[in-house]
Amino acid sequence: MTLHTSPILHSLLDTDAYKLHMQQAVYHHYYDVDVAAEFRCRGDELLGVYADEIAHQVDLMRFLSLSDDEFTYLSSLPFFQQDYLNWLRNFRFNPQQVSIKNNAGKLDIRITGPWREVILWEVPLLAVISEVVHRHRSPNVTTEQAVAQLSTSLESFRQNSMNVDLSQFKLMDFGTRRRFSGDIQQTIVTALQADFPYLIGTSNYDLARRLGITPVGTQAHEWFQAHQQISPTLANSQRAALQMWLREYPTHLGIALTDCITMDAFLRDFDLPFAEAYQGLRHDSGDPVDWGEKAIAHYQRLNIDPMSKTLVFSDNLNLDKALVLYRHFCQRVNLVFGMGTRLTCDIPGVKPLNIVIKLVECNGKPVAKLSDSPGKTICQDQNFVCELRKAFDLPRVKKAS
C-alpha cells in the first residue's frame, strides 16, 4: 500500500465551528478537566490497515497553528473573547495525546489529556481517517463526479419542490468529518453557493472564512457528557450543562442539542427559563417527525410561540428527507437543515464511513451518550449506563456498544 506523506490538513480552522465554541467555554470554566475520547467505526469495516498512515498525518498536525489572518477573522466574530483567542494563537496539537493501533485489523484510537486540548482532535482526525481510507479505496474519484452527483440531487430537489414555497428553507453544510476529501468539500460548498440560494452557512470555519459564508454550530454531545462527571449530582448534569453554556454565551449560539440522554429526559430539564433563553433545538437521533412534534408541543405547553424558535435537523439527512420535514413543519416552526455526508461524500460507487470519536471518560470516570437511537449509544461502563438511566428516570434499553 502506497503511503501518502504530504499533509491532508493545512489549517487549524479546518474543523467544525462548535469545537471552537466549546473549547472557549472549556478554557474559561473547565481548564483543568481531563478527558479521554475513543474512535468507533459503526460499520464492519476493518480500518486497522490504515493505522500507520493515519498516525503519520496525526504527527503532521503538530505544525498547524492559527495564522494572523485567521486570528483577525475569529476576532471579528461577536462571541469569541480575546483571552481565549490569544491562547488559541499559541495552541499546537500534541500527537502524544493520540494512541493509534491496528488491533487485529480493527482501528483503535484513544485520545487523552486536558479537555481544552483533546476537544480539537475529533473533527480533523475523522476527516483525516475518511480521506486516507477513500483515497486508497477510490483513487480515481474526481471532483467533477461529486459535482455531477450534486447537480443530480439539486435537480431532483427542484422537481420535487416545484409546488412548495421554499422561502423559509435553509441548508447548512455539516460535512467536514466524513467528507471524501477537503477538496471535494470545498468544491461542493462552492457549487452550492453558486447554484442553491438556500445555503446559509457551513460548520467549517476554514471554508466560512475563505468563501465568505456564515460559520454555524453550537455544542456537541461531549459538552453534556462531561457534565455527567463535572456536576456534583448526576440527575442535574444536563441542567448544569445548559446553564453553563448560557453563562458563556448568553446571547449567541443558542441551539441546544437534545439527545445526549434522550429527548424526553431533555425536555423534562428544558423548563421555561431555558426554553426562553435558547433560540432552539437540534435533532441528531431518533424519528425526526416525532422529535419535532415533541419540541413544538413543549414550546406550546410553556406558552412560547414555536414560530419564535428554530429546530435544526442534522441526523443523516439528504435533500429529499429535508424536503419531507420542511413540508411537515414549515408552517409551525422555523427550520434549518444540517447536511453532512450526503453533501461531501455523495459519490456513486463510494461508501461513506460511519465513524465517530466520542468522549468516554471525564476526570477518570465514565461518561455516556444514550441518544434516541439505541445503535448510537456509547459507553464502556454498563454500571454507569444503569446509573444514568436511573438518574434520568429512563426505561431499560439494549446494551450499549
Swiss-Prot record:
Domain of life: Bacteria
One Pfam family linked to the record: NAPRTase
GO biological process, one term: NAD biosynthetic process via the salvage pathway
Post-translational modification note: Transiently phosphorylated on a His residue during the reaction cycle. Phosphorylation strongly increases the affinity for substrates and increases the rate of nicotinate D-ribonucleotide production. Dephosphorylation regenerates the low-affinity form of the enzyme, leading to product release.
Database matches in InterPro entries: N/Namide_PRibTrfase (IPR041525), NAPRTase_N (IPR040727), Nic_PRibTrfase (IPR006406), Nic_PRibTrfase-Fam (IPR007229), Nicotinate_pribotase-like_C (IPR036068)
Keywords annotated in UniProt: Ligase, Phosphoprotein, Pyridine nucleotide biosynthesis
Record has Protein biosynthesis as a keyword: no
GO MF, any single term: nicotinate phosphoribosyltransferase activity
Modified residues (Phosphohistidine): H221
Gene Ontology annotations for the cellular component aspect, listed alphabetically: cytosol
Catalytic reactions on record: nicotinate + 5-phospho-alpha-D-ribose 1-diphosphate + ATP + H2O = nicotinate beta-D-ribonucleotide + ADP + phosphate + diphosphate
EC numbers, comma separated: 6.3.4.21
Involved pathway(s): Cofactor biosynthesis; NAD(+) biosynthesis; nicotinate D-ribonucleotide from nicotinate: step 1/1
Intrachain S-S bonds: none
Similarity remark: Belongs to the NAPRTase family.
Role according to the record: Catalyzes the synthesis of beta-nicotinate D-ribonucleotide from nicotinate and 5-phospho-D-ribose 1-phosphate at the expense of ATP.
This protein's name: Nicotinate phosphoribosyltransferase
Organism: Pectobacterium atrosepticum (strain SCRI 1043 / ATCC BAA-672)
